[in-house]
Amino acid sequence: MTPESQLFAAVTLINLEGDLLDQGEFTAWLDLWQHDGLYVVPIDPNETDFKNTLNYACDDHRMREKRVHRLYSGESISTTPRARTLRTLSRFRLLEANDSLIVVRGAQSLWEHRKGHSRHYAADITWQLQREGDRLRIQQKVIRLVNSDDVLHSIGYIL
């Protein structure tokens, strides 16, 4: 595959992920992941050792399933009512590509509306996508919020 075709395949998956999250299709979102994949929202924007530092989220498969369960169940006050989100993904840059792995960095502008209030969150995101047969799956997603080291409101949805 050419770098352009690898980037196109990656962006196709990334846009699908964003749409699934905004539409509340969380079970389908879980299916986009490698079983051993990691979903990370670090506090320190420069951190790379996610498993040994404090993060807003550092979710393996089990924790992603629990997060989705909370979103569907309504049992958590931070998810009731469920926030409506709309995200725009852009500025995709291919950082690495080979036959089994594609690494892409991009920007996300996410609007949340809940209980009569709208909030905006901007982030740099890095996706590590692993080829599994004829499809790509998310191996790691790191969401570096531009205001991650500031006070954040309760985020009751998946970035």
Language model features with spans:
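Short helix-to-loop capping/linker segments positioned immediately adjacent to catalytic or ligand/cofactor-binding
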Residues: 17-19, 75-82, 114-116
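A beta-strand edge to alpha-helix "cap/lid" segment located at domain peripheries
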Residues: 86-88, 93-159
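A solvent-exposed, acidic/Ser-Thr-rich amphipathic alpha-helical stretch
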Residues: 35-104
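Generic detector of well-ordered alpha-helical segments enriched in charged/polar residues
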Residues: 11, 65-69, 156
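Short, low-complexity N-terminal intrinsically disordered segments enriched in polar/charged residues
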Residues: 1-35
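Conserved aromatic-histidine-acidic binding/catalytic patches
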Residues: 2-5, 52, 117
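A generic "alpha-helical surface" signal
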Residues: 8-12, 62, 120
